[in-house]
Amino acid sequence: ALTACSGGGTGETDSLTPEERTQRFVTAITDARSEEDNEYNSILSSADDDPADMTFQLLGVTAEDMESFAISVSLMNVKAYGLAVIKPAQDSEDTVNEGLQGFIDQQQQNFQMYLPDQYEVAKNARLETLEDGTVVMVMCEDQDTVFDSIIDSLQAG
């Protein structure tokens, strides 16, 4: 039998287990960041991790909304910072997108008045859904470079 593969090389991600996909997401974020960011902004990839509940609340999602995820956000309100690579659970695409957009909107409001540089970072955040349904949010300095690096990493596998 012949299987058609859409999405220019992203088809193989469909054969990954959620755990393998999660690891790929973590690697994509790690490789896209500076050593300093990797040191200070841990990556949440399991609902069992300590800051999971607080992080999910901040992003407007639950563990049930996500099949696989790697998330790194600043829980302190001094920096507009958030990276998320999420494979939504079936029928949760809208919930994930709306939650992440809500996070971006909230960050913009938080920084608009008192930290103009962080407001710019929040304003330039990127939120996109890839062909395979994976949702990518990038809010950090130099967001386009980080975003492109994450995408390249995910597609290279």
Segments (PLM) and residue ranges:
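A short acidic-to-branched-hydrophobic micro-motif
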Residues: 80-90
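C-terminal motif of bacterial Sec signal peptides marking the signal peptidase cleavage site
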Residues: 2-6
